[in-house]
UniProtKB/Swiss-Prot annotation:
It holds the Pfam family DUF1967. PROSITE patterns: G_OBG, OCT. NCBIfam families: Obg_CgtA_exten. This is GTPase Obg. Residues 1-61 form the OBG-type G domain. Keywords: Cytoplasm, GTP-binding, Hydrolase, Nucleotide-binding. It comes from Corynebacterium melassecola. An essential GTPase which binds GTP, GDP and possibly (p)ppGpp with moderate affinity, with high nucleotide exchange rates and a fairly low GTP hydrolysis rate. Plays a role in control of the cell cycle, stress response, ribosome biogenesis and in those bacteria that undergo differentiation, in morphogenesis control. It comes from the Bacteria. GO terms for molecular function: GTP binding; hydrolase activity.
């Protein structure tokens, strides 16, 4: 459609002859012949400006109503599939200070170790399950670890007792129990910590502190 036109006849403050001529143009030419709205104004004297403003407002509002509504683009969020991967989540290296021992590093196993209450059998069993599912048991086997090998994760050392023997089915036990904890030869968390300190030369093996009698029998049993 053609653009709407408005005719503005300025200088309405001119002599009467000019205003009469403008009235003639308005009636005979623009409005009757072309159908264009005509406004006789005076920009200097600021006369007859309000009718012009109201007409412009009417035109704008009418144009907005006739404008086709734009459809808002739908934002489609496609969540990425979560892939559970174990490769590269931990590393197993020989312990340079313990013969046959291994050190395991990795964000997940180290965090799990710190979150575990080692005085709670169920918590320890849950930790063992998580480490096994992560692939640590298989990794230790491939690294040549034997049952009872000293394994250190996040500064915590323990004797490795695998949940399964290579090629065997897992041993099923009741909730909150772990057959590996029932072995009497397993040392406590405090003993593991002390052994680690002795191994690193932080304390003497037979030093139990002031007013404590040191003996190898006490340490071993």
């Amino acid at each position: 459609p053609s653009a709407l036109r408005l005719v503005l006849l300025n200088k309405a403050d001119a002599p009467e002859a000019l205003k009469s001529f403008a009235e003639v143009l308005k009636v005979r030419l623009f409005e009757k012949q072309f159908g264009w709205p005509v406004f006789i104004i005076s920009a200097v004297a600021r006369k007859a400006l309000d009718p012009l403003k109201y007409k412009l407002l009417e035109i704008v509002q009418d144009a907005r109503k006739k404008r086709p509504k734009e459809k808002a683009e739908s934002v489609i969020i496609k969540p990425k599939a979560v892939v559970h991967r174990t490769k590269g989540q931990f590393q197993i290296k020989p312990d340079p200070e313990v013969q046959g021992g291994f050190i395991i590093t990795g964000e997940k196993p180290e965090r799990w170790i710190l979150q575990t209450d080692f005085e709670n059998d169920e918590a320890v069993g849950y930790l063992a399950d998580r480490l096994s599912k992560l692939g640590i048991e298989d990794g230790l086997r491939k690294a040549g670890a034997h049952v009872g090998a000293n394994v250190t994760i996040g500064g915590i050392s323990f004797e490795w007792e695998p949940m399964t023997t290579a090629g065997d089915d897992p041993i099923l036990t009741g909730r909150g129990t772990d057959v590996r904890l029932e072995q009497t030869s397993r040392i406590s968390a405090a003993e593991r910590k002390r052994a680690s300190q002795v191994r690193r030369g932080l304390i003497d093996e037979l030093d139990y502190g002031e007013d404590q009698e040191a003996s190898r029998e006490r340490w071993e049993g």
